[in-house]
Amino acid sequence: MREIVHLQTGQCGNQIGAAFWQNISGEHGLDSNGVYNGTSELQLERMSVYFNEASGNKYVPRAVLVDLEPGTMDAVRAGPFGQLFRPDNFVFGQSGAGNNWAKGHYTEGAELVDQVLDVVRREAEGCDCLQGFQITHSLGGGTGAGMGTLLISKIREEFPDRMMATFSVVPSPKVSDTVVEPYNATLSVHQLVENSDETFCIDNEALYDICMRTLKLSNPSYGDLNHLVSAVMSGVTTCLRFPGQLNSDLRKLAVNMVPFPRLHFFMVGFAPLTSRGAHSFRAVSVPELTQQMFDPKNMMAASDFRNGRYLTCSAIFRGKVAMKDVEDQMRNVLNKNSSYFVEWIPNNVQTALCSIPPRGLKMSFTFVGNSTAIQELFKRVGEQFTAMFRRKAFLHWYTGEGMDEMEFTEAESNMNDLVSEYQQYQDAGVDEEEEEYEDDAPLEEEV
């Protein structure tokens, strides 16, 4: 089967990753030790996408857990699903990266990277037909951002034809951990533009907003945020894990979603978002879910798609729904919001359907959109980057690890290029696109 190797790096990556594994273990009927006690054949049918089968009906996640300090790893190991993972797959250093991208990418991380690649290689060799890799990390820290991008580029070298999907937590202005986040994020985006095939952008600020506004939680914990992220990750990967009428895998998703190779940063959303106590009081219908899904308040990245246009988007339905209902509703939404979709990509909305709903819900809807509005997110980080870099603030932490100022300048201009590429396609109309082709066409000679 089409296996995926999962990597989680840094504190954020490991916590999101742990929530993800907890979530999908439940969906596949595994208990906290990985022993199968589910009821449905469908849970077993494609178990091998994410799990290796060990002896005694036990399943082990195909996950590699990486960090430069032991703290988070110990927390994962001591957590409810700590016994699930293979002990050899925990790879950690002792020193920590101290939120310094250069430490993760060039010094501390570079020392550990070969150990990690050995584990990745071992997992990949055990696969029947490896589909690709997915990595969870944050872009604001040292290990997830610096070492995470180092791993991505090393894996890219070794497996150039496999898919690379990343779930990247982008630093947000209101919820900031450290002052150097803009540096780390810009340097990471510089790497992701070149080396990742699809990047799902998740934003702490948007997650907090969802928790406060929609879920009515007065002070959300990171556990609540991770719970939201794991719902989206589970949704995006549904089609791979369960049989359905319209299955898409990572590659199909990329083919349908990425019109130009550099523009592979997606916004994700999930519906129904109801607080944990409220969902037993109301039924959800396909129209309601579709409405919710296109609501900016449901997006997990803090940029409003109404300020941009969708190049492409993909909707993944889960539950017992008729394909016709879904198609009708999607058409309905498209007709109402046609101004938010570019006209020069016809049929730019793809729908996939899986008949198995997530735990505790009748049906759910995961949304992945490639919108030009994501440039707001990069602009925001870029402005903060420029403000600090102009004064060369905090730069000695990076140059001390052997980085050059030139690298910062390159990363900055690459990110600015990305923003202007998004802007260019946002403004492009059908006529302009056609004119470009007409200019290229050879003139017919008069006879």
Curated annotation (Swiss-Prot):
Main subcellular localisation: cytoplasm
Magnesium recorded as keyword: yes
InterPro entries, alphabetized: Beta-tubulin_BS, Beta_tubulin, Tub_FtsZ_C, Tubulin, Tubulin/FtsZ-like_C, Tubulin/FtsZ_2-layer-sand-dom, Tubulin/FtsZ_GTPase_sf, Tubulin_C
PROSITE patterns, alphabetized: TUBULIN (PS00227), TUBULIN_B_AUTOREG (PS00228)
Residues where GTP binds: 11, 69, 138, 142-144, 204, 226
Entry keyword annotation includes GTP-binding: yes
Ranges of compositional bias, category Acidic residues: 429-447
Annotated segments matching region Disordered: 426-447
Sites where the protein binds Mg(2+): 69
GO cellular component, one term: cytoplasm
Subcellular compartments: Cytoplasm, Cytoskeleton
Single annotated GO MF: GTP binding
Keyword annotations of the record: Cytoplasm, Cytoskeleton, GTP-binding, Magnesium, Metal-binding, Microtubule, Nucleotide-binding
Cofactor: Mg(2+)
Listed GO biological process terms: microtubule-based process
Family affiliation: Belongs to the tubulin family.
Protein function: Tubulin is the major constituent of microtubules, a cylinder consisting of laterally associated linear protofilaments composed of alpha- and beta-tubulin heterodimers. Microtubules grow by the addition of GTP-tubulin dimers to the microtubule end, where a stabilizing cap forms. Below the cap, tubulin dimers are in GDP-bound state, owing to GTPase activity of alpha-tubulin.
Record text on subunit structure and interactions: Dimer of alpha and beta chains. A typical microtubule is a hollow water-filled tube with an outer diameter of 25 nm and an inner diameter of 15 nM. Alpha-beta heterodimers associate head-to-tail to form protofilaments running lengthwise along the microtubule wall with the beta-tubulin subunit facing the microtubule plus end conferring a structural polarity. Microtubules usually have 13 protofilaments but different protofilament numbers can be found in some organisms and specialized cells.
Protein name per Swiss-Prot or TrEMBL: Tubulin beta-2 chain
Lineage: Eukaryota, Fungi, Dikarya, Ascomycota, Pezizomycotina
Gene encoding the protein: TUB2
